[in-house]
């Protein structure tokens, strides 16, 4: 409810970038309209998603100078910053978000209203796909609820904490997704050890993703310039070491056997990956183990005891039931915004616009320009250029303030704030990814476009329609891949998203390989689709303000936060992504594939030959 406020309250909001009255807006969780309430915070989070490059004194000068995309001139390195980020993904590193919450509890009185909003955010994060867009939105909304309850009354703000690197997007991922620090646990020490083992494995894979780029760059990276650089941009995908174009920088990807698992820095991760089945066993959803570890709601427990179904089967049944309900009501999500009136409700598509901003010009969403047309620009390229400009401007502005503060104190500026430090803008905002790396292979990148789009309900439904069209396109034994492009070409005939052409433009830009990978090949994509709980993500809280507050209060009073997919399946997905970045030798690869396929089938989840996706895509 909007009400008159003092000029002092308004000034406090404006000094932190919030639009007047923004902090009075009721919090409903994963609300796309919130992104328009603070442009400064949006720029800050975009900047926080980038690596920082500093001069490499050991690097020999390059003959070709700085490339046109600003990726570096051969004298800069991102390894040091990547190592700092990698150290966040460790069990013996305190969670940054937990530390923030602890500091607030020490300094300020605990507010019941804040507890309710925080509980809703935690609840929603367990029903959202793991992707860059979700990370960004979660960080933004965490800052929103903290400022909503503590900025007007106490002058405490989260705006600027990410930009000054007091908090990292990796902390957000660790708190809300990789570890789930707020999740109640039952079963005592044994269950906590099992969950810590899970956290160790998934964080180790995230850590390896960052350091795998570091290793690839230090061993074979070269500045992309001249004819050699142009050849690298268009190098075909295949086996063995190859070069992939990632937002203007050339990075190496690896083929089977070209692994780095024997180095001291990755040996513990290598051992954990070999033990993935042992880590998964106590946390999987089979038989008696279903109730061990994470505390589940009474409804979940009753359902699990009545019907012997895996988490995958339960999730699929819930999704089909929701679709039937929408059909019966004639309330398809696409009908919520009339055709031709997309621009009348632009806030509805802000998540899609954010996805384009985060992925444009990277290996996950390349800027495709037909050379025969003579064109030099395309929408994806323009979005990427705007993002890079925003990131560089933010860095220059904040770095100037920090260096001035340090000069006043007679100190040298921190290592990553010196005059020679600059954001690796050409690599893109890879730190928003749960597995942060810029590698590309086979027309795919580290971020899946379709996983990101599923954060919007209309797109979740449209992707399910797209998959059904691909599957049902031919009655003959044609390849599923052959049905992707025709189904995309006819997309507007069966998926009336009324989004101003956003989704279709993105689907055409990403290409059929990335779509095929998401729909049929990659276990992480398949599990991401199942992780989305429509009733939680889009069906709560109630639209009535009083009912919504009661709903949030009940969540805070009985915090049974759990996702639909068991952690055993997630362990498999992260192990798969690790081997996708650096496939093991054929014997080890064969052993893993057989075990993984058996595990997926036992859950009722079918994917096309895992060895194809593991060696062909990334």
UniProtKB/Swiss-Prot annotation:
InterPro entries in the cross-refs: Herpes_env
Chain sites annotated for binding Zn(2+) 1: 95, 98, 175, 181
Principal place of residence: host cell
Region of interest (Zinc finger 1), ranges: 95-181
Binding residues annotated for Zn(2+) 2, in chain numbering: 448, 451, 518, 525
UniProtKB keywords: Host cytoplasm, Host nucleus, Metal-binding, Zinc, Zinc-finger
Pfam families: Herpes_env (PF01673)
Signal peptide: none
Region span, Zinc finger 2: 448-525
Function according to Swiss-Prot or TrEMBL: Plays a role in efficient localization of neo-synthesized capsids to nuclear replication compartments, thereby controlling cleavage and packaging of virus genomic DNA.
Family per record: Belongs to the herpesviridae UL32 protein family.
Protein name: Packaging protein UL32
């Amino acid at each position: 409810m909007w009400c008159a406020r003092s000029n002092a309250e308004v000034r406090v909001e404006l000094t932190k970038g919030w639009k007047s009255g923004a902090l009075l807006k009721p919090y409903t969780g994963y609300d796309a309209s919130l992104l328009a309430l603070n442009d400064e915070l949006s720029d800050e989070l975009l900047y926080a998603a980038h690596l920082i490059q500093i001069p490499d004194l050991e690097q020999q000068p390059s003959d070709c100078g700085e490339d046109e995309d600003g990726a570096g001139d051969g004298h800069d390195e991102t390894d040091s910053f990547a190592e700092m980020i990698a150290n966040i993904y460790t069990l013996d590193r305190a969670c940054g978000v937990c530390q923030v919450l602890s500091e607030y509890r020490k300094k300020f009185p605990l507010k019941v209203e804040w507890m309710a909003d925080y509980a809703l955010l935690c609840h929603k994060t367990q029903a959202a796909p793991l992707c860059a867009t979700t990370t960004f939105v979660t960080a933004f909304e965490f800052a929103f609820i903290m400022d909503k309850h503590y900025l007007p009354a106490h002058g405490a703000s989260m705006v600027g904490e990410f930009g000054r690197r007091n908090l990292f997007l990796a902390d957000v991922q660790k708190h809300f997704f990789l570890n789930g620090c707020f999740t109640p646990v039952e079963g005592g020490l044994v269950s906590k050890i099992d969950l810590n083992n899970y956290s160790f494995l998934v964080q180790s894979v995230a850590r390896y993703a960052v350091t795998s780029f570091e290793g690839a760059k230090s061993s074979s990276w070269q500045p992309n310039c001249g004819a050699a650089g142009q050849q690298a941009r268009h190098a075909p995908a295949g086996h063995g070491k190859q070069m992939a174009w990632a937002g203007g920088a050339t990075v190496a990807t690896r083929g089977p056997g070209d692994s780095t698992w024997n180095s001291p820095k990755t040996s513990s991760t290598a051992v954990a990956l070999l033990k993935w089945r042992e880590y998964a066993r106590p946390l999987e959803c089979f038989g008696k183990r279903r109730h061990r570890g994470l505390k589940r709601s009474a409804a979940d427990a009753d359902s699990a005891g009545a019907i012997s179904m895996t988490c995958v089967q339960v999730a699929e049944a819930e999704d089909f039931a929701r679709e039937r309900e929408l059909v019966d009501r004639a309330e398809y999500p696409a009908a919520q915004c009339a055709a031709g009136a997309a621009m009348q409700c632009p806030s509805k598509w802000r998540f899609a616009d954010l996805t384009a901003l985060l992925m444009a010009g990277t290996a996950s969403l390349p800027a495709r320009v037909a050379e025969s047309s003579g064109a030099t620009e395309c929408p994806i390229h323009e979005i990427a250029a705007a993002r890079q400009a925003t990131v560089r401007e933010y860095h220059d502005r904040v770095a100037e303030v920090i260096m001035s503060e340090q000069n006043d104190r007679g100190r040298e500026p921190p290592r990553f704030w010196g005059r020679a430090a600059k954001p690796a803008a050409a690599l893109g905002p890879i730190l928003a990814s749960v597995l942060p790396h810029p590698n590309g292979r086979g027309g795919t990148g580290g971020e899946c476009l379709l996983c990101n789009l599923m954060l919007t309900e209309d797109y979740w439904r449209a992707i399910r329609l797209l998959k059904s069209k691909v599957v049902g396109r031919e009655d003959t034994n044609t390849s599923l891949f052959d049905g992707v492009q025709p189904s995309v070409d006819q997309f507007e005939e069966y998926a009336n998203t009324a989004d101003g052409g956003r989704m279709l433009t993105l689907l055409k830009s990403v290409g059929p390989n990335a779509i095929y990978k998401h729909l049929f090949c990659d276990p992480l994509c398949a599990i991401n689709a199942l992780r989305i709980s429509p009733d939680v993500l889009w069906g709560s809280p109630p639209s009535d303000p009083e009912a919504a507050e009661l709903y949030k209060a009940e969540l805070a009073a009985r915090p049974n936060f759990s996702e639909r997919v068991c952690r055993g399946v997630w362990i498999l997905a992260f192990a798969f992504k690790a081997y996708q970045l650096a496939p093991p030798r054929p014997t080890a690869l064969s052993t893993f594939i057989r075990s993984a396929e058996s595990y997926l089938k036992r859950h009722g989840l079918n994917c096309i030959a895992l060895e194809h996706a593991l060696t062909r895509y990334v």
